[in-house]
Amino acid sequence: MSSKEQKTPEGQAPEEIIMDQHEEVEAVEPNDSAEQVDPRDEKIANLEVQLAEAQTRERDTVLRIKAEMENLRRRTEQDIEKAHKFALEKFVNELLPVIDSLDRALEVADKANPDMAAMVEGIELTLKSMLDVVRKFGVEVIAETNVPLDPNVHQAIAMVESEEVPAGNVLGIMQKGYTLNGRTIRAAMVTVAKAK
């Protein structure tokens, strides 16, 4: 026997063995290439992920900016509305001492004296027309008695015992208060009833 015949497995010719070895090599090669990933495909997949993340960030940014713009628009409208409503506040604050002076003049005027009747009537008409004008611009007088004390519109100066007015209610007005479009610009100075 030759050396080739000794090494061959039984029943197989040497050519068959060589062909089998080539088939095994060929069969292995396609498996190796299937396991290998093309670096371009991997890079494309990474870029697609990055693109999706960037698009999500961009959408979030756009939505956030839209919300901020809407909030800014709303705040600006509110600020403008308040500016229109309360633009007169300084002016009204300057008028209040004049109104107070007319009120005091009426309180101390001798209404029984016929010589003073014309002057008292003039002061009353002046005060009435001034209050009518400021009411047109949203100013309201706080001068009610026998109402519960409201710290938003009343400033308690003293407590006085009273049987006619329930405890905790306004008994008397020391100085009138005023509101401008619902905002207190000067609280009324009041005396408050307390139980005996």
From Swiss-Prot:
Official protein name in the record: Protein GrpE
Subunit record text: Homodimer.
Protein role: Participates actively in the response to hyperosmotic and heat shock by preventing the aggregation of stress-denatured proteins, in association with DnaK and GrpE. It is the nucleotide exchange factor for DnaK and may function as a thermosensor. Unfolded proteins bind initially to DnaJ; upon interaction with the DnaJ-bound protein, DnaK hydrolyzes its bound ATP, resulting in the formation of a stable complex. GrpE releases ADP from DnaK; ATP binding to DnaK triggers the release of the substrate protein, thus completing the reaction cycle.
Positions of region (Disordered): 1-40
GO cellular component: cytosol
Family stated for the protein in its record: Belongs to the GrpE family.
Keywords, comma-separated and alphabetical: Chaperone, Cytoplasm, Stress response
GO biological process, one term: protein folding
